[in-house]
């Protein structure tokens, strides 16, 4: 027998393998799983074993010699002429010390540093990008940190520099910020250049401040709400497009968070993303633990949202909050139309 392609899968309760030839997932016992792990690695089925699978049409020899992306042949063209977005990490510094931050020291990777980007480096990156996006329909420049607004002067220089060199192409500016450094000058700048803005806010004061604190240990909720009020007063139309990112940790009270975003007049349905603490590489696993209460609250709200989409119940503030959770699915799957064919009972040839 030639080479076969399978993928072994283990869950807390059972063991399986995925068979490419029949596009099937098959449950197996412990002994079979160990043999299949070897098959997965060697791509060869030992003689005289796993006969019941072979008889069922599984573990067939594959005719595939190589798998590649449909755009593989165009990669060079895309990279050299259609580069879509430039992300500048303008600093690795941050004025907050959030417990679940990827750079907090609670993950097995780098922690916050004093590294910052200088303007010469930024110019080289922008020049590199402009040279390789000449055939793109529009440009996109994003600023990332740390906390990017610690380098507000650099960001202003970068925006000015790319605007002078972009030609007649449209450009989108994007930034994710913790919302604590939004002075009047910053607000005026963001509105002027129509930044796509995402602000981190973990719901009500108690839920937010337990994780998102300044270096001194003081919570950041109050100053963020003050800045949001100032931004909304400055330009309400711009503010209506601002997005918010809410991270749920084991210490969060999801019921209070939903209530806060539903009732606080600063927020509209559809502007809040809800995420859980990333458990990958996390040293303190308790931070990412989902409590039973939070699980029940989220599932109930999600079911309400689905029923509202299906027009089985009226929309309420909470179900509107979760409407964004369907957007990823809607972006992936376009509506498909099906044609039903009625075949004759007897086919004459």
Predicted regions and their residues:
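Short helix-coil junctions and helix-kink-helix linkers
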Residues: 37-44
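N-terminal [4Fe-4S]-dependent radical SAM core
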Residues: 3-18, 22, 26-27, 47-87, ...
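Conserved alpha-helical substructure of the radical SAM core
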Residues: 72-188, 192-193
